[in-house]
UniProtKB/Swiss-Prot annotation:
This is Catalase-peroxidase. It comes from Rhodopseudomonas palustris (strain HaA2). The gene is katG. Belongs to the peroxidase family. Peroxidase/catalase subfamily. GO terms for cellular component: cytosol. There is a cross-link at residues 97-219 (Tryptophyl-tyrosyl-methioninium (Trp-Tyr) (with M-245)). Disulfide bonds: none annotated. PANTHER family: CATALASE-PEROXIDASE, HYDROPEROXIDASE I, BIFUNCTIONAL CATALASE-PEROXIDASE. Homodimer or homotetramer. Coiled coil: none annotated.
Length: 732
């Protein structure tokens, strides 16, 4: 209603003018379930078009030429943003680190995989101050090589080249990160101001899924917890935040010390003289932020944050000086020119170079979080070993850096380029390559018949297949049916996977696998991973046929079975869902979202659209996919048949819904005239009748002519989940 009418065109301008931007639906109804995240970063916002294959483009890239240009860039200091010590290495390492460092294990989101650092809010986080300059320095190279290298890959590659140009041998590099074209609206914290810290409860318990201590930081406050310069207390924050990025103590020490072997921090003057961040800047600033009125605003006068620290005597060369200085001096608290808390070496000579004046020397300085590596007992032990064994330090940093920058890429089949390391690493969730002939159509038909004749129900087969495949997270490409890791701890014991039923299904499928493979004479085999999925597909086909719909569920063999020694059980714990609306499950662990929010979150991790989510859930309900075999949301008199009954009966106006008087989060649907109990459902079920957008989708599937379309749409969504981790299919 704030929009003005354009008299000439006789319509309303979609942009707000005058008194405000106008109210959005979310302003009127802030508690309304937001399903828009299911449609972000769609092909409609991608300028490359549907036929663009980035992985193929990258493989045609002259990688040596790019690397040569990046090496030249490192020492080509620009007047508009001069390089510290005549070398951009430290700046570029920080850019790559901060691109990758947003990754968090809890939900797999963040990380370097999509080039999100160029979008809000990351491009304007306080911890990313002046990284806009690093990206602008890279623009001529990105412009030169065009679509053959993404921003996401270029950030990481630049970090690697920066390290190599300063004398460090990296572990390797993989390309293949395709750019996205709009910001990811992730939950970065509840705070409404930069550096707020309302994310803690109890004894400094950090809320899930967050991976940083304050809003706008990558990890921790370098001055200490909330600015308290206590290295031991800071170590607790470091350990927690780095663990949430999948790093153990050794990797953490190696990363901090390795990164701080290079470059400097920038606190040359009063931080209040820094201008707005990129997203808050003036139009004429063209996306550059943090314009400073202190001195020249750059070079020796640059202000990025508070501390003004240079860690080593050779900030553009790989060395062991970080540990030599850390243990070689005693440290006293000091303040930077910007007023930030930092530490200086007691009784030391000034042997640290100035970044711009070769005639000046500085005292050795450290951050509070650097001293944590000496004063935390566990970190101290590792740090002393690295001090005494520089080769171990170099190897640990190389491996940790590779893990940091590749953790969210998923399995090695997604890696591209000639610099990919040959070694398989446990955090890559390796799966053996296919080493046998795959089953053909006749074999598949025979195996389906064998599975359906095994005594396993439609519900059991569907539940096992969905449990195996639905661990997939599109965020970091982990999980999924390939590998059949559902037969290992911890997945086989998760409550959501119904361990007793699962064990029965796996036992019968393993027997079928053994019998089939033992009968072959031509080297043909079927994996258990394939059989689990095939069992679900066969059950869906049977359920559709029993409902009067003949439909074939696509199945592509080629999954392999991972070995237990290839599986880091602890790392898979984060894949266990607290809640899963598709299976009408709410776990015993603390919930951070409502059940319906958890459903949308799970759908987004599975890379589903709202229509796909709707069809999939409606089908799973009637097929008996609920955990514990509950009847909540099973709105049908024909269970284990693939009907559209869930939608028909949910939208039936003969039923009136009310909260259950005996069971929390359960609702009772009673006959409006007689009061007789007809159905029970959860919040997840009823949201498809309550939420206007989801109701519109439910209506499509509740119509009298909807059964064939529903069956097709369910099968399409089912197949998408079953194949979510089949990157080998995409590669072919």
């Amino acid at each position: 209603m704030d929009a003005k009418t354009d008299d000439k065109d006789g319509g309303k301008c979609p942009f707000p003018h005058g008194g405000g931007r106008g109210r959005r639906n979310s302003d009127w109804w802030p508690e309304h379930l937001d399903i828009s995240l299911l449609h972000r970063n769609s092909t409609l916002s991608d300028p490359m078009g549907k036929g663009f294959d980035y992985a193929r483009e990258f493989e045609s890239l002259d990688l040596d030429a790019v690397i040569k240009d990046l090496h030249a860039l490192m020492t080509d200091s620009q007047d508009w943003w001069p390089a510290d010590f005549g070398h951009y290495g430290g700046l570029m390492v920080r850019m790559a680190w901060h691109s990758a460092g947003t990754y968090r294990t809890t939900d797999g989101r963040g990380g370097a995989g999509a080039g999100q650092q160029r979008f809000a809010p990351l491009n304007s986080w306080p911890d990313n101050a002046n990284l806009d300059k690093a990206r602008r320095l890279l623009w001529p190279i990105k412009q030169k090589y065009g679509n053959k290298i993404s921003w996401a890959d270029l950030y990481v590659l630049t970090g690697n080249v920066a390290l190599e140009s300063m004398g460090f041998k990296t572990f390797g590099f993989a390309g293949g990160r395709a750019d996205t074209w709009e910001p990811e609206e992730l939950f970065w914290g509840p705070e409404g101001s930069w550096l707020g810290d309302e994310r803690y409860s109890g004894e400094r318990e950090l809320s899930d899924p967050l991976g940083a201590v304050q809003m706008g930081l990558i990890y921790v406050n370098p001055e200490g917890p909330n600015g308290n310069p206590d290295p031991v207390a800071a170590a607790k924050d470091i350990r927690e935040t780095f663990a949430r990025m999948a790093m153990n103590d050794e990797e953490t020490v190696a990363l901090i010390a390795g990164g701080h072997t290079f470059g400097k921090t920038h606190g040359a003057g009063d931080p209040s003289l820094i201008g707005a961040e990129p997203e808050g800047g003036a139009l004429e600033d063209q996306g550059l932020g943090w314009k400073s009125s202190f001195g020249t605003g750059f070079g020796a006068d640059a202000i990025t944050g508070g501390p003004e620290v240079i860690w080593t005597q050779t900030p553009t060369q790989w060395s062991n000086h970080f540990f030599e200085n850390l243990f070689g001096f005693e440290w006293e608290l000091d303040k930077s020119p910007a007023g930030a808390k930092q530490w200086k070496a007691k009784g030391a000579e000034a042997n640290i170079p100035d970044p711009f004046d070769p005639t000046k020397k500085r005292l050795p300085t450290m951050l509070t979080t650097d001293l944590s590596l000496r004063f935390d007992p566990a970190y101290e032990k590792i740090s002393r070993r690295f001090l005494e064994n520089p080769d171990q330090f170099a190897d640990a940093f190389a491996r940790a850096w590779f893990k940091l920058t590749h953790r969210d890429m998923g399995p090695k089949v997604r890696y591209r380029g000639k610099l990919v390391p040959k070694e398989d690493l446990i955090w890559q969730d390796p799966i053996p390559p296919v080493d046998h002939e795959l089953v053909g159509d006749k074999d598949i038909a025979a195996l389906k018949a064998k599975i359906l004749g095994s005594g396993l129900s439609v519900s059991q087969l569907v539940s096992a297949a969905f449990a195996s495949a639905s661990t997939y997270r599109h965020s970091d490409k982990r999980g999924g049916a390939n590998g059949a890791r559902i037969r290992f701890a911890p997945q086989k014991d998760w409550e959501v996977n119904q361990p007793s039923d699962l064990a029965q299904v796996l036992s019968k499928l393993e027997a079928i696998q053994k019998e089939f493979n033992g009968a072959q004479t031509d080297g043909k085999k079927v994996s258990l991973a394939d059989l689990i999925v095939l069992g679900g597909c066969a059950a869906v086909e049977k359920a559709a046929k029993d409902a009067g719909t003949d439909i074939q569920v696509p199945f592509t063999p080629g999954r392999m079975d991972a070995l237990e020694e290839q599986t880091d059980a602890d790392s898979f714990k984060v894949l266990e869902p607290r809640a899963d609306g598709f299976r009408n499950f709410i776990g015993k662990r603390k919930q951070y979202m409502s059940p319906e929010e958890s459903l949308v979150d799970r759908a987004q991790l599975l890379n589903l659209t709202a229509p796909e989510m709707t069809a999939l859930l409606g089908g799973l309900r009637v097929l008996g996919g609920n955990v514990g075999h509950t009847t909540h949301g099973v709105f049908t008199e024909r269970p284990e048949k693939l009907t559209n009954d869930f939608f028909v009966n949910l939208l039936d106006m003969k039923t009136a819904w009310s909260p259950s008087a005996t069971t929390e989060v359960v609702y009772e649907g009673r006959d409006r005239k007689t009061g007789e109990l007809r159905w029970t459902g959860t919040r997840v079920d009823l949201i498809f009748g309550s939420h206007s957008q989801l109701r519109a989708l439910a209506e499509v599937y509740a119509q009298s002519d909807a059964q064939p379309k529903f069956a097709r749409d369910f099968v399409a969504a089912w197949t998408k989940v079953m194949n979510a981790d089949r990157f080998d299919i995409v590669a072919k």
